[in-house]
A protein has these predicted regions:
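Catalytic palm active-site di-aspartate
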Residues: 239, 270, 312-326
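C-terminal polymerase-core module
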Residues: 326-429
C-alpha cells in the first residue's frame, strides 16, 4: 500500500478489513507507529476509519511507559487495543524480553492468567502472575490488599546476616572435561514454594504443623494452603506435563514448537513468582517469604552436592538450581538415574537430566585465570547440539561480526565428539 496518498490508503484498508474480516491483525510497530499514523491521517482527512469489528467502539489507547527489569531499562510503546478482533504487535511485546514473541505463548498466558490476549501479549509475566493471585484470592474469599508495600519486620544485624542471602554458586573447575551430565532441578524456586507452602501469609506464622527455614529458623505454617503455593500448583503440574510431552517429539516435529511456546509461557510465570515475593509491588508477598525460598534453595543445592559425592560423583560446578557431575564410565542416562532418584528422595524436589556432554569447557575468569568464570561455558551434547552460555554471541551488545565469528568457531569444534581432537581444530578456526 502506498503511503503517499493517505486518503486512498485509508479507503483501501477499510475495504480490505470489510472483505476479509480478520479475527487477528498482526503488525510490526503497529502500536508505536502504524495505528497512530492511521488515526491521525483519518482525523486530518475526515475519514471514518474504524479498525475494530465493533462499530460502536473504535479502539482503546494505552499510554507508553518505561520500566526496569533485572538491571535493564525497557520502553513499552503506546498500545492500540481493538474491539471484536485482536491487534498483536510483535515489536511491542514484553514477552520479547526473555525469548522471541510467540502468539501461542500469549494465548497460553491469557488462558492461565484469565487476562485478555491483547493485554497478555504486551504485559510482563509479573502482571500475569499478579492476576493469577488475585483470581485465586477471590475464589477463596480473601480480600485484595489496597496497599502494595508491606513493611519489613525489624531484624538485628545477626538475624539479617543469617536470613538475607541469594542463590548458592560454586565456581567451576576450569578446563576441558569429558562425559559430563547436567542435572537441573525442575522449576526449583516455584517448586520450593509449593512443597514448603510458602506464601506471604504462611511464612513467620506458627501452627500445629510447622516447617522451619534453614539457617534463620523462621517458621512456616503447614496448617492451611498458602495462596501463592495453591496458585503455583496447577501451573507447575501443567508445565511438567508439557515438558514430558515434548520429549516424545523430535525438534523438527510440528508439535514441538507448539509445546515449546506453551512451556516458555508457563516457565516465565513460574520464574517471576519467586522474584515477586520480595518485590515491593507484590500484593500478597513479603520479604521473609523471599528470604525463605533462597535459604531452602541453598540447602537443597548443598544436599544435592553431598549426595553426588557420597555416590562417587565429581561435581564440576553447581549454580543455584543445577549441577554438572562426572564419574568414570558414566556416559548414559541410566548411569545417573540412581543419583537423581536419591536427590529427589532427600530434597522432595524433581531433578531432571538436561543432557550428557561429549565434552564441556569451563572458561577462566578474566581477572584471575586460576578461577573459573561463574557462568561462561560451552560444550557439545552427545546428540550433537551445542550449548553456549555467557559467551560473546549471547550478549545483546556484541556486534554481529564478532558473534558470527565466534559462532562459526564453536560450530567447527562441535563437529568433533572426541575432546582429544579439539586442539587440532583450533588452527582451522
Amino acid at each position: 500500500l502506498d503511503l503517499s496518498d493517505e486518503r486512498e490508503l485509508l479507503e483501501n484498508l477499510k475495504n480490505i478489513l470489510d472483505e476479509y474480516d480478520p479475527d487477528v491483525i498482526f503488525t510490526r510497530w503497529g502500536d508505536g507507529w502504524l495505528f497512530p499514523f492511521l488515526f491521525e491521517s483519518a482525523k486530518r482527512h475526515q475519514v471514518d476509519f474504524n479498525p475494530s469489528r465493533d462499530a460502536q467502539q473504535k479502539y482503546r489507547h494505552i499510554q507508553e511507559s518505561t520500566f526496569e527489569s533485572y538491571g535493564s531499562i525497557y520502553f513499552r510503546a503506546q498500545q492500540t487495543h481493538l474491539f471484536g478482533r485482536w491487534h498483536i504487535d510483535n515489536k511491542n511485546s514484553t514477552m520479547d524480553m526473555g525469548f522471541k514473541f510467540s502468539m501461542r505463548s500469549a494465548i497460553e498466558l491469557a488462558r492461565v492468567t484469565s487476562v485478555d490476549v491483547q493485554t497478555a501479549a504486551r504485559n510482563s509475566p509479573g502482571s500475569g502472575f499478579t492476576a493469577m493471585q488475585i483470581q485465586g484470592a477471590l475464589k477463596r474469599g480473601i480480600l485484595i490488599p489496597l496497599q502494595k508495600r508491606q513493611t519489613e519486620q525489624f531484624k538485628s544485624a545477626l538475624e539479617l546476616n543469617a536470613a538475607d542471602g541469594g542463590g548458592l554458586n560454586y565456581r567451576p573447575i576450569v578446563g576441558l572435561h569429558q562425559d559430563i551430565a547436567e542435572l537441573d532441578f525442575f522449576s526449583m524456586y516455584p517448586s520450593i514454594m509449593m512443597t514448603w507452602n510458602i506464601s506471604g501469609e504462611t511464612v513467620g506464622v506458627r501452627g500445629k504443623k510447622i516447617r522451619y527455614v534453614p539457617d534463620s529458623g523462621v517458621p512456616i505454617t503447614q496448617d492451611v494452603d498458602g495462596l501463592v503455593a495453591s496458585v503455583l500448583k496447577p501451573l507447575l503440574e501443567k508445565r511438567l506435563r508439557v515438558k514430558r510431552m515434548m520429549k516424545k517429539f523430535t525438534p523438527d516435529d510440528p508439535q514441538h514448537p507448539i509445546l515449546q511456546s506453551v512451556a516458555d509461557a508457563l516457565k516465565w510465570l513460574g520464574y517471576v513468582s519467586f522474584g515477586y515475593q520480595g518485590y515491593k509491588n507484590n500484593l500478597f508477598g513479603n520479604i521473609q517469604a523471599h528470604e525463605a525460598i533462597c535459604a531452602i534453595g541453598r540447602e537443597t543445592l548443598v544436599t544435592a552436592i553431598e549426595t553426588a559425592h557420597e555416590l562417587g560423583f565429581r561435581v564440576l560446578v553447581a549454580n543455584v538450581d543445577s549441577l554438572f557431575v562426572q564419574k568414570e564410565a558414566a556416559n548414559r542416562p541410566q548411569d545417573f538415574k540412581p543419583l537423581m532418584d536419591e536427590i529427589m528422595f532427600r530434597t522432595g524436589l524433581i531433578i531432571e537430566l538436561e543432557g550428557i556432554f561429549d565434552w564441556l569447557i569451563f572458561t577462566a575468569s578474566k581477572l584471575n585465570p586460576r578461577i573459573g568464570a561463574a557462568n561462561r561455558y560451552f560444550g557439545k551434547f552427545d546428540h550433537g547440539e551445542l550449548k553456549v552460555r555467557g559467551m560473546a554471541q549471547r550478549r545483546s551488545d556484541t556486534c554481529n561480526w564478532i558473534a558470527n565469528a565466534e559462532r562459526e568457531i564453536l560450530n567447527l569444534l562441535a563437529s568433533e565428539s572426541n575432546p582429544a581432537h579439539l586442539p587440532a581444530l583450533i588452527s582451522q578456526a
